[in-house]
Amino acid sequence: MLVLGSLRSALSCSSTASLISKRNPCYPYGILCRTLSQSVKLWQENTSKDDSSLNITPRLLKIIPNDTDIVTLEKQDELIKRRRKLSKEVTQMKRLKPVSPGLRWYRSPIYPYLYKGRPVRALTVVRKKHGGRNNSGKITVRHQGGGHRNRTRLIDFNRWEGGAQTVQRIEYDPGRSSHIALLKHNTTGELSYIIACDGLRPGDVVESFRRGIPQTLLNEMGGKVDPAILSVKTTQRGNCLPISMIPIGTIIHNVGITPVGPGKFCRSAGTYARVLAKLPEKKKAIVRLQSGEHRYVSLEAVATIGVVSNIDHQNRSLGKAGRSRWLGIRPTVRGVAMNKCDHPHGGGRGKSKSNKLSMSPWGQLAKGYKTRRGKNQNRMKVKDRPRGKDARL
């Protein structure tokens, strides 16, 4: 930085000397006047050449940053402005003219930033639909079948590739409730899809620190790891890093379980987890999941900063049964509407399950029945999710 100032207008020798002598009687008035006048003359001789060459009046106090500083400051200002704008942004719901019941009750969130074209074909594959049936033709997953043809997007849940990556666009994915982001590596130019976090927009730069701290970041910190600077640089929205590098209390998503595995938890729309504690002696961390359950994960497991995008997915209304069929979801028949041979609630005169407890088609109790007992308990679970009146909404 080049700092230019003026002592001509700011320092009037007589007034300044009188002010100093009044506050400090030990300094004589005459000596102060001579000293100040000499300093002003020396300053004028030294700065007259610089002022004439730069065409800057000495009365003006200006700070002229370097080109690199200007670029950095502009980027920071743009980022802050965009975050303020996003914080005030309210998602509008799409409503259609109520010509029919299916249009009357249809609600869908509007996201103007979504890309309207086709996905990158090299990052998609064709997956044949099986209608919820296994290799022997038996239904193993109910309520599946039909639906519109689509290609499965290949999502990078591991994020092993380091270096800065720029978000090209945010896309709709028919295979999941969240949105996805197309990334382009700034060095190699390689394309990849990741789960988009809330607030991620085209032009943003994200980075993965799963393989460690890059040398460029170490050089910025002076060759030594400064925890404060490292936390500010790495814990940005959309960045992927080990849980050992994430501060306690940070909101994360796409949380892994093992040191080398992909992200497993909190991948659907609007979900997130929170880092509660780190236990270096056990090489584990405690994470609170979306359900409220506290769970152990590896301290070197992967996680991404932020909340999963498409938070208003829960507020949508399909409006009619046909839209569920377009999504590949078949109807769910009530047990009391079935025959006795098909469901424990079936049969009888009228639609009543009699005095039986609610249960599944295979006789398993549906309300309050614990399915894990004894040695089959999950050892990684620290605290069970809240139930009943304490359940999370």
UniProtKB/Swiss-Prot annotation:
What single Pfam family name could you report for this chain, choosing any that match? Ribosomal_L2_C
Primary localization class, coarse: mitochondrion
Which residues does the Swiss-Prot or TrEMBL entry list as transit peptide?
Answer: 1-43
Q: Where in the cell is it found?
A: Mitochondrion
Renumbered to this chain, the Basic residues biased-composition regions fall at 369-380
**Gene Ontology biological-process entries:** mitochondrial translation
**Compositionally biased region (Basic and acidic residues):** 381-393
Q: What family is this?
A: Belongs to the universal ribosomal protein uL2 family.
What does the subunit section of this Swiss-Prot or TrEMBL entry state? Answer: Component of the mitochondrial large ribosomal subunit (mt-LSU). Mature yeast 74S mitochondrial ribosomes consist of a small (37S) and a large (54S) subunit. The 37S small subunit contains a 15S ribosomal RNA (15S mt-rRNA) and 34 different proteins. The 54S large subunit contains a 21S rRNA (21S mt-rRNA) and 46 different proteins. uL2m has a Na/K ligand binding site.
Q: What is the role of the protein in this entry?
A: Component of the mitochondrial ribosome (mitoribosome), a dedicated translation machinery responsible for the synthesis of mitochondrial genome-encoded proteins, including at least some of the essential transmembrane subunits of the mitochondrial respiratory chain. The mitoribosomes are attached to the mitochondrial inner membrane and translation products are cotranslationally integrated into the membrane.
Q: What else is known?
A: Present with 1600 molecules/cell in log phase SD medium.
| Protein's recorded name | Large ribosomal subunit protein uL2m
